[in-house]
């Protein structure tokens, strides 16, 4: 590998690390794991209960950080602290990849 190619590869890896994108996250595995999320967040990432936020289309790095914080107990929510306690690092990455990959459409309601 020549110097220019090596520098380009190093730059690409650095950009991925800085962006917080989980390299190798599996959207399909995230969808399978999301079955445990559907009662509150829905399989489409759109909230089913007032207490749960809609998470569809949120950035992958944000979702992963929040799941990690709930799992570590640094972010407090009784339900989420319990639900995330059994998640592996791969589960967190996969769930974040799945919910961030959901495309949402914003529609303006007439009269608003």
Please provide the spans of the model-predicted regions.
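Sequence context surrounding c-type heme c attachment/ligation sites in exported
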Residues: 24-38, 56-65
């Amino acid at each position: 590998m020549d110097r220019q190619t090596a520098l380009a590869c190093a730059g690409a890896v650095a950009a991925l690390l800085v962006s917080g994108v989980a390299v190798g996250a599996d959207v399909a595995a995230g969808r399978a794991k999301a079955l445990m999320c559907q009662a509150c967040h829905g399989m489409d990432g759109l909230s089913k209960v007032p207490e749960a936020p809609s998470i569809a289309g949120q950035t992958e790095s944000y979702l992963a950080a929040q799941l990690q914080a709930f799992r570590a107990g640094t972010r407090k929510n009784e339900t989420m602290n319990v639900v995330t306690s059994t998640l592996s690092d791969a589960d967190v990455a996969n769930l974040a990849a799945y919910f961030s990959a959901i495309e949402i459409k914003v529609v303006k309601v007439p009269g608003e």
